[in-house]
Amino acid sequence: MTDRVALRAGVPPFYVMDVWLAAAERQRTHGDLVNLSAGQPSAGAPEPVRAAAAAALHLNQLGYSVALGIPELRDAIAADYQRRHGITVEPDAVVITTGSSGGFLLAFLACFDAGDRVAMASPGYPCYRNILSALGCEVVEIPCGPQTRFQPTAQMLAEIDPPLRGVVVASPANPTGTVIPPEELAAIASWCDASDVRLISDEVYHGLVYQGAPQTSCAWQTSRNAVVVNSFSKYYAMTGWRLGWLLVPTVLRRAVDCLTGNFTICPPVLSQIAAVSAFTPEATAEADGNLASYAINRSLLLDGLRRIGIDRLAPTDGAFYVYADVSDFTSDSLAFCSKLLADTGVAIAPGIDFDTARGGSFVRISFAGPSGDIEEALRRIGSWLPSQ
């Protein structure tokens, strides 16, 4: 039997998942893990969602749904855009996906061919780069720094040559948490329309924005040619339910329907039924309560990092991460994070995951967990850093 592995499978790992594996082993062997490596909310799904799931299990009516998702959920999502953003979204434009990860795969397959040039910010979410590379696209990474809040601008896109076929933006962004101001997102969307470039707008962290940050906006407020990606994982704390959605332009809907029907048949039906209840006032109040907890954690982490000598931090407008410059201590963030875990039991994510050129000098620290974990992590890191 041949030992050949397809070339497209040779993408880099998502290093955060490797960190999680090492963290689990640390907990198994030492029992002292403090895990600040991933965007895993400590809160569970809202109570109305869990109650709806229990009722659906009791009825035992969990066969396939149509590929694009159950009508009740598509209706609820469409109505939520009117409430939150004041825009009218037809339920037919909403496509339910197997997490936002499944949504990105569908969007990239529907929008781009092998060889197409697709731009993204660096630092940025590594799975954009890795999925696009596996599909044969040419990924154009745009170095972004403090001058633009680690975000691309329409002017930066206009200066790229040869021309692009697509652009991926995220607001709030992972790993930095920065928000693209509404006027800049509108400028990016307008430039994409004028340049025949497909915009993919990652809005997974909408709802998680802190006081004083720019307001978040939806790409569809400017352009219905964009593909919007969102998820139940972050604001609604439903990571393991594997449910997300797309807003899809009319011209792409049949293609997305065919792709999802062939790939997954349908998203998880139990999750779909339960998620309808995420849009109740009770569930929204619970999710907003989580945001208040994250805000406390954010202050704890930002203040604590500065006290221990890590003070060059990306503006943490939203999401639940701090992207920190640790160049005073290392130029190899992967080795730095591995040693931190081995020496102290604290797990954080290496910046090399998010920026292949400059990420050796950065780390990402999540504050989605309990406040006590953040306080303990700061104590351990503060004791450990002077020896590095």
From Swiss-Prot:
Keywords for this protein: Aminotransferase, Pyridoxal phosphate, Transferase
N6-(pyridoxal phosphate)lysine carried by residues: K234
UniProt-listed SUPFAM superfamilies: PLP-dependent transferases (SSF53383)
PROSITE patterns: AA_TRANSFER_CLASS_1
Entry EC number(s): 2.6.1.66
InterPro entries: Aminotransferase_I/II_large, AspAT/PAT-like, NHTrfase_class1_PyrdxlP-BS, PyrdxlP-dep_Trfase, PyrdxlP-dep_Trfase_major
Family matches, as CDD domains: AAT_like
Main EC class the enzyme belongs to: transferase
A GO term from the CC aspect: peptidoglycan-based cell wall
Domain of life: Bacteria
Pfam families, sorted: Aminotran_1_2
UniProt GO BP: amino acid metabolic process; biosynthetic process
GO molecular function: pyridoxal phosphate binding; valine-pyruvate transaminase activity
Cofactor(s) it depends on: pyridoxal 5'-phosphate
Catalysis: reaction(s): L-valine + pyruvate = 3-methyl-2-oxobutanoate + L-alanine
Family: Belongs to the class-I pyridoxal-phosphate-dependent aminotransferase family.
PANTHER family referenced in this protein's UniProt entry, alphabetically: AMINOTRANSFERASE, ASPARTATE AMINOTRANSFERASE
Protein name as catalogued: Valine--pyruvate aminotransferase
Source species of the chain: Mycobacterium tuberculosis (strain ATCC 25618 / H37Rv)
Lineage, broadest ranks: Bacteria, Bacillati, Actinomycetota, Actinomycetes, Mycobacteriales
Gene: aspB
